[in-house]
Amino acid sequence: MPRSIKKGPFVDHHLMKKIDEANATGAKKPIKTWSRRSMVLPEMIGKTIAVHNGKQHVPVLVSDNMVGHKLGEFAPTRTYKGHQADKKSK
């Protein structure tokens, strides 16, 4: 179920602090975060946020259609390399 409207969106305080500082200074440097659970807000549009996927930080350029989604949705954690080919059938 989606989050209740009366609760509002959730964003970690340390991430919001970094975004406010980047908006005030106009910095273009990616904002590194481990907070996959934070929701994308309109203040983040145009920023590059490096979201941790468990192994490395994946750069995510935030656009207007991402607002309302979680940051973790844009940094996949699993890599699928395919099933091994069946050598008997040849």
From Swiss-Prot:
User: Which GO annotations describe the biological process of this protein?
Assistant: ribosomal small subunit assembly; translation
What keywords is this UniProt entry annotated with? Ribonucleoprotein, Ribosomal protein, RNA-binding, rRNA-binding
- Protein name (record): Small ribosomal subunit protein uS19
Where are the disulfide bridges? none
The answer on whether this UniProt entry bears the keyword Transport reads: no
What InterPro entries does the annotation carry? Answer: Ribosomal_uS19, Ribosomal_uS19_bac-type, Ribosomal_uS19_CS, Ribosomal_uS19_SF
- Report the Pfam families cross-referenced here: Ribosomal_S19 (PF00203)
